[in-house]
A protein has these predicted regions:
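Bacterial Sec-dependent N-terminal signal peptides
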Residues: 10-40, 256, 280-297
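Structured interaction patches on ligand/partner-binding surfaces of diverse proteins
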Residues: 69-71, 95-142, 240-268
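Exposed, polar/acidic Ser/Thr-rich sequence context and nearby capping/turn residues
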Residues: 146, 159-163, 225-226, 235-284
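Bacterial N-terminal signal peptides that target proteins for export
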Residues: 1-4
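Structural motif
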Residues: 34-46, 158-166
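Secondary-structure boundary elements
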Residues: 134-140, 150-153, 160-169
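Conserved "repeat-terminator" motif of extracellular CCP/Sushi domains
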Residues: 145-152, 220-226
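Tryptophan-paired
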Residues: 48-102, 167-255, 291-297
Length: 297
């Protein structure tokens, strides 16, 4: 028996493949392998894998499976008729994550949403990956490679020169209520933020002598769709109870992105517009250069 395995090396694109039919009557099928989009995620423990296969033409659910490991996923083969499909995989999608519209009677690829029951939970990362594939022969074996990326963004705030024992607390005001993994962004990647928004708390931190005031790394939903900036509200509180308020606008956060806000206490203004510097494929630094909140004003 001659088996042809077709490796789809680029996820999130229409899959164009060469293939041969088998020389017996046994049907072929589709297998799914998972890889990491961000090399930093190599070695991540995976103990929960959900897999959906949708008809890309009408949005209907074709298959839905739940596995305990990536090996279980790779060992399964799906017998699919000729057609156009989108394969969605999600890993570590456990509480406080939830799946919206997740009933087999109504589930449609355009309705499926990943959300957080508590927007401020900052849980360990869950991951998703999508492959778009066309099957034009039913007795050929295909294998897809889904590149898995973070559902959530990461945000860390650093403020240099904050006086000792000052407290910082705040909120991100327009994080999305969820991510729609099978809807496309303008750049063609899968995974758009919802248009509905909510707030995410920035936990209390106290300035320690000799150290930069730094938040924990927050894991949060990306900026809600329809907004051109991420909106933050921060308060610095002196030991005597004097409160200074700061309204901040920054670039949009995307799913899987890592964002670092770097500020100087002496340069902070009540209204600040932050600009971005790219550090690597996933990470941006946001700083204040003295612009007014809306540069067009």
């Amino acid at each position: 028996m001659v088996w042809l395995w077709v490796l789809l090396c680029v996820p999130c694109l229409w899959a164009s493949c060469d293939h041969d039919v088998h020389n017996d009557e046994e049907e072929g099928g589709l297998s799914v392998s998972l890889t990491w989009a961000d090399e930093a995620d190599q070695g991540t423990d995976v103990n929960d894998v959900k897999l959906w296969i949708f008809n890309a033409d009408d949005g209907s659910l074709v298959e839905e499976k739940h596995h305990g490991s990536t090996q279980e996923v790779a060992s399964q083969r799906f017998a699919l008729p000729v057609g156009h499909y989108q394969i969605l995989a999600a890993t570590n999608l456990i509480e406080p994550f939830f799946i919206g519209e997740a009933t087999r009677a109504t589930l449609n690829m355009n309705q499926l949403m990943f959300g957080l029951s508590n927007p401020s939970a900052s849980p360990d990362h869950a991951y998703y990956g999508v492959t778009d594939i066309g099957i034009d022969k039913s007795n050929v074996n295909y294998i897809t490679k889904n590149e898995m990326r973070h559902i959530l963004a990461e945000l860390t705030i650093f403020i240099e020169g904050v006086p000792d024992n000052f407290a910082m607390i705040g909120k991100v005001l327009n994080v999305a209520t969820g991510l729609l993994p099978l809807q496309k962004n303008e750049d063609g990647t899968f995974g758009t933020a919802s248009y509905t928004k909510e707030e995410c708390d920035i936990p209390l931190r106290i300035a320690v002598p000799g150290e930069t005031l730094k938040t924990e790394t927050l894991r949060l939903m990306p900026t809600a769709n329809g907004f051109h900036t991420t909106k933050l509200f921060i308060q610095l509180i002196s030991p005597g109870g004097v409160v200074s308020n700061y309204d901040i606008e920054a670039p949009v956060m995307k799913s899987g992105g890592k964002y670092k806000i770097n500020l100087e206490f002496e340069e902070m203004k009540p209204y600040m517009y932050l600009t971005s510097t790219k550090i690597d494929d996933w990470t941006e630094e946001w700083i204040y250069r003295g612009e007014i909140l809306n540069p067009e004003d």
